[in-house]
């Protein structure tokens, strides 16, 4: 099949004219120089894609436009496709020609919709409210209804990958969804009014790093892993706060981690282990499977560790 016979790009429901209007007005503005300079991009062996720092606060109320919703820590480049109708003419299959600039703007508009929807879902999570597909279409997706599967999938992936929040369908008939923390963990770090971003995703990464190292991971290994995400010892992070306090105090007090001196080390070195609450709520297998799902490279890099974890759980060790 030639490239001309492949699927067409999805467009807003109102057609080409509405698409052009959307490209100019519906959030397709390029980021400012300050926003680009403020973005912290990195890639992690545990978390695929490009991460960017999340601004400290969100705008109040439901997102109406990308200008009213700060960028989520994910940069997504994708194209939304739909299959041509059978029997359509070659010209219909090809669709209207678009310039590279229009293509780029349309992709950016879709990416902005992903950001909007992810923010909307985060608000639903904090409010402990269910959300329906109809509500998402009406309040966020709007003219991009044909692209809903892609936008919804990318937004859900972002929540799971970065914040450790899973979007689960609870009623297929009404397309109703609930948002819960991943892997059975009961912690999200939203303890005060100023806490707006769940921290479960970072906890899963730390637990995953420990699982990949065996029973424990040195402090150096943990900070090296977090460093590629832009999370550094002693440096305040927009989403996670002060990471050293989070790891060595908060999560230790919550019994998700143990932080102890390496026996016999002189000068003293420290290591992290799973705490009793982590062991009670989840397992090495679940954490490693989560890591594998968010980054297929882990399956290649750590196959023996994954097999060992599976065997360990089967034996009840």
Swiss-Prot record:
Record field: compositional bias (Basic and acidic residues): 1-14
Top-rank taxon: Eukaryota
GO biological process, one term: negative regulation of transcription by RNA polymerase II
Keyword annotations of the record: Tumor antigen
GO terms of molecular function: histone deacetylase binding
InterPro entries: MAGE (IPR037445), MAGE_N (IPR021072), MAGE_WH1 (IPR041898), MAGE_WH2 (IPR041899), MHD_dom (IPR002190)
Region of interest (Disordered), ranges: 1-102
One cellular component (GO) term of this entry: nucleus
Expression (tissue specificity): Expressed in many tumors of several types, such as melanoma, head and neck squamous cell carcinoma, lung carcinoma and breast carcinoma, but not in normal tissues except for testes and placenta.
Bias kind Polar residues: ranges: 66-82
MAGE domain mapped to chain residues: 110-309
PANTHER family: MELANOMA-ASSOCIATED ANTIGEN 4, MELANOMA-ASSOCIATED ANTIGEN MAGE ANTIGEN
Role according to the record: Regulates cell proliferation through the inhibition of cell cycle arrest at the G1 phase. Also negatively regulates p53-mediated apoptosis.
The protein's name: Melanoma-associated antigen 4
Encoding gene (name): MAGEA4
């Amino acid at each position: 099949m030639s490239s001309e016979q492949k699927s067409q790009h999805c467009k807003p429901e109102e057609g080409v004219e509405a698409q052009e209007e959307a490209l100019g007005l519906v959030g397709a503005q390029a980021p400012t120089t300050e926003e680009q300079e403020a973005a912290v991009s990195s890639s992690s062996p545990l978390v695929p894609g490009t991460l960017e720092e999340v601004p400290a606060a969100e705008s109040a109320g439901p997102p109406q436009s990308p200008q009213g919703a700060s960028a989520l820590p994910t940069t997504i480049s994708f194209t939304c496709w739909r299959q041509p109708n059978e029997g359509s003419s070659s010209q219909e299959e090809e669709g209207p020609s678009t310039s590279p600039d229009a293509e780029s703007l349309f992709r950016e508009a879709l990416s902005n919709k992903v950001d909007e929807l992810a923010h909307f879902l985060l608000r639903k999570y904090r409010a402990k409210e269910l959300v329906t597909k109809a509500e998402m279409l009406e309040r966020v997706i709007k003219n991009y209804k044909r692209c809903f599967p892609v936008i919804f999938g990318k937004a859900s992936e972002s929540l799971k990958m970065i914040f450790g929040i899973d979007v689960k369908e609870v009623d297929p008939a009404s397309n109703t969804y609930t948002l819960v923390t991943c892997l059975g963990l009961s912690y999200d770090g939203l303890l005060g009014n100023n806490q707006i971003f769940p921290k479960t995703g970072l906890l899963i990464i730390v637990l995953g790093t420990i699982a990949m190292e065996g029973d424990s991971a040195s402090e150096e290994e943990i900070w090296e892993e977090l460093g590629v995400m832009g999370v550094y010892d002693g440096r305040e992070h927009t989403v996670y706060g002060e990471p050293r306090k989070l790891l060595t105090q908060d999560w230790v007090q919550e019994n998700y981690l143990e932080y102890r001196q390496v026996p016999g080390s002189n000068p003293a070195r420290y290591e992290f282990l799973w705490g009793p609450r982590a062991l009670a709520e989840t397992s090495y297998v679940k954490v490693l499977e989560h890591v594998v799902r968010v980054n297929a490279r882990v399956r290649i890099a750590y196959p023996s560790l994954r097999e060992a974890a599976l065997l360990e759980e089967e034996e009840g060790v």
